From Swiss-Prot:
The keyword 4Fe-4S is assigned to this record: no
Location in the cell: Cytoplasm
Binding site for FAD: G13, G14, G15, H16, A17, G18
GO BP field: tRNA methylation; tRNA wobble uridine modification
Protein name: tRNA uridine 5-carboxymethylaminomethyl modification enzyme MnmG
Cross-referenced Pfam families: GIDA, GIDA_C_1st, SAM_GIDA_C
Subunit record text: Homodimer. Heterotetramer of two MnmE and two MnmG subunits.
InterPro entries: FAD/NAD-bd_sf, GIDA_C_N, MnmG, MnmG-rel, MnmG-rel_CS, MnmG_C, MnmG_C_subdom, MnmG_C_subdom_sf
Purpose of the protein: NAD-binding protein involved in the addition of a carboxymethylaminomethyl (cmnm) group at the wobble position (U34) of certain tRNAs, forming tRNA-cmnm(5)s(2)U34.
Source organism of this protein record: Variovorax paradoxus (strain S110)
């Protein structure tokens, strides 16, 4: 049957990528359909019950700054919040939250069901409708054909998924859900380059059988015994949105645990060749950890509550595909878990992914127009990476329906830009996870300023509603106004008593400074600075903690950030210069055969993307630029002229 309505955007899959893709496209006015094999699992946290972390929290904040759902859903569902790296610089501080699975899923579903321009439909997709070189819709398992101008595929671990527990294995998308075998076969027919990856999950435990007196309590920020204040994830969030807070607990593996794990190596699918897919380097299975770090006597295991209305606990750190009898023994070998009852066995899952180097910068596939990929299908791991990709693909699918150019954030603008750029230029050999270390401009890509970097762009795209825009505008204007006020107030040895200077600054000042300069000093904060000379320099109206934080960080890191801006500008002269789609790299005789081969294979859209392909040297980029300019290629020279004209314009 051909469904009587046609859509602008069809999103296949209702996980973290799919929900953000559907919400983004619909917010932009595209008539959107979200197809899921089970509406009850929309927004489900398939593995760990947490959101955020180093690098990941930055992505969540960016999704939020663009109007996405993940951060605000976490504020409504979070049962423990912590700021990681709180003693380090602001660039690497990151928010992490434990979430109640039921509350999180409900928060996401509520937004999906109440989003204008978005329809939901429960059916697994078995086929894509392709006419010529363009996708025109999707077909479900009962033969319902939905036509659309674009399709965003967010299939997660479902593509030809196979679960492994010991030497036993069976087809599944995740525990309790069927795999997408027909869809996987259809994608292989389309000759899209694919591979296999794997991920895993630990056994779940019944909290009633855990002896917490033998474990170490880990309180969240804002809880008794924790640091404070209690964080929020969304720029529109408040601490009073959070439900009841709960502690996590810490136990450890030991020599006996390790011996038990080793005794199961001969029945491990990892070590017997049953699993071909590569697992995530930074979230290895417990058997992989024991094998790789044989000299380590113990590993921390975090016991994380799954929610407020369940006794289920997630033992973070023992993801495993070992046989169940080994899982049973290894769990009971740890302090506090001697009598632990396993509710669900751990398992590994293998699934298809597709080489992200075959995607355009917009995440549209090169070979099939209108078909976008997002999430684990691109070789990534993690809820946060999936959500960011989904939002990005949803934006660009909607823009294509409008006939507009794709939105492409740069590496110096967003972690989302780093994520996209890494995937399409470097590809993956293992599941990709975001870290702050992947961003060369991380001083300006902080959690605290994600809205300052992206909300204006989100407003122009149609992603940001009036309430968020008004809140952002007030914050932006307040920070700007107060920063300028601090720059305009000057103090010197004559008008600032020495005793006051020593109290706030640690020593008397020797010449004239403005207050912004004084705020740059490491030991000076805004609050103490405003107490100078009886508070005569304080602002007329009080500022929020968030506004003060933004002012302080901007002042203290201004020198470093200015240097990073200079680096960005030096690279910008070729970053966005577009390469002709039909360019023949064999014409550039001075390029090595290897470089010509790689450029011809990847067909980078800009010189910046070309420069980040493995094996393409700076010298090769210079040769390419010289050849294009000498050759007088119209498209290239037009872009170069546009860039030069833009650079010559005075700042507005």
């Amino acid at each position: 049957m051909l469904y009587p309505e046609e859509f602008d955007v069809i999103v296949v899959g209702g996980g973290h990528a799919g929900t953000e893709a559907a919400l983004a496209a619909a917010r932009m006015g595209a008539k959107t359909l979200l197809l899921s094999h089970n509406i009850e699992t929309l927004g489900q946290m398939s593995c760990n019950p947490s959101i955020g972390g180093i690098g990941k929290g930055h992505l969540v904040k960016e999704v939020d700054a663009l109007g996405g759902a993940m951060a605000i859903a976490t504020d409504e569902a979070g049962i423990q919040f912590r700021i990681l790296n709180s003693s380090k610089g602001p660039a690497v501080r990151a928010t992490r939250a434990q979430a109640d699975r039921v509350l999180y899923k409900a928060a996401i579903r509520h937004r999906l069901e109440n989003q204008p321009n978005l329809s939901l439909f429960q059916q697994a997709v078995d086929d894509l409708m392709v006419e010529g070189d363009r996708v025109v819709g999707a077909v479900t398992q009962v033969g319902i054909a939905f036509r659309a101008r674009t399709v965003v595929l967010t299939a997660g671990t479902f593509l030809d998924g196979r679960i492994h527990v010991g030497l036993d294995n069976y087809q599944a998308g995740r525990a309790g859900d069927p795999p997408a075998v027909s869809l996987s076969a259809r994608l292989k027919e389309l000759k899209l380059p694919q591979g296999r990856l794997k991920t895993g999950t630990p056994p779940r435990l019944d909290g009633r059988s855990i002896d917490f007196s033998k474990c170490t309590e880990q309180a969240g920020d804002g809880m008794p015994g924790g640091a404070g204040p209690m964080p929020v994830f969304s720029f529109m969030g408040r601490a009073d949105m959070h439900p009841q807070q709960m502690p996590c607990w810490i136990t450890h593996t030991n020599a006996r645990t390790h011996d038990i794990i080793r005794s199961g190596f001969d029945r491990s699918p990892m070590f017997t060749g049953k699993i071909d897919g590569v697992g995530p380097r930074y979230c290895p299975s417990v058997e992989d950890k024991i094998n790789r770090f044989a000299d380590k006597e113990s590993h921390q295991i975090f016991l994380e509550p799954e929610g407020l209305t369940t006794n289920e606990y997630y033992p973070n750190g023992i993801s495993t595909s070992l046989p169940f009898d080994i899982q049973y023994q290894l769990v009971r070998s740890m302090p506090g878990l001697e009598n632990a009852h396993i509710l669900r066995p751990g398992y590994a899952i293998e699934y298809d992914y597709f080489d992200p180097r075959e995607l355009k910068s917009s995440f549209e596939t090169r070979s099939i127009k209108g078909l976008f990929f997002a999430g684990q299908i691109n070789g990534t791991t993690g809820y946060e990476e999936a959500a960011a990709q989904g939002l990005f693909a949803g934006i660009n699918a909607a823009l294509q329906c409008r006939g507009e150019e794709a939105w492409l954030p740069r590496r110096d603008e967003a972690y989302l830009g780093v994520l996209v750029d890494d995937l399409i230029t470097k590809g993956v050999t293992e599941p990709y996870r975001m870290f702050t270390s992947r961003a060369e401009f991380r001083l300006q890509l902080r959690e605290d300023n994600a809205d300052m970097r992206l909300t204006e762009a989100g407003r122009k795209l149609g992603l940001v509603d009036d309430a968020r825009w008004d809140a952002f505008s007030r914050k932006r204007d307040t920070v700007s106004r107060e920063t300028e006020r601090l720059k305009s107030i000057w103090v010197n040895p004559r008008n600032l008593p020495a005793a006051e200077s020593e109290r706030v600054l640690g020593k008397a000042i020797e010449h004239e400074y403005n207050l912004a300069d004084l705020l740059r000093r490491p030991d000076v904060n805004y609050e103490t600075l405003m107490s100078l000379d009886g508070g005569k320099y304080s602002a007329g109206s009080p500022l929020s903690e968030i506004e003060i934080e933004q002012i302080e960080i901007s002042a203290k890191y201004s020198g470093y950030i200015e240097r990073q801006h200079d680096e960005v500008e030096r690279a910008a002269h070729f970053e966005n210069l577009r390469l002709p789609a039909d360019f023949d790299y064999s014409q550039v005789k001075a390029l090595s055969f290897e470089v010509r081969q790689k450029l011809d294979k990847h067909r980078p859209e800009t010189l910046g993307l070309a420069s980040r392909i493995s094996g393409v040297t700076p010298a090769a980029i210079s040769l390419l630029m010289i050849h294009l300019r000498k050759g007088g290629h119209k498209a290239f020279n037009r872009d170069a002229a546009t860039e030069a004209a833009a650079e010559s314009q005075p700042a507005q």
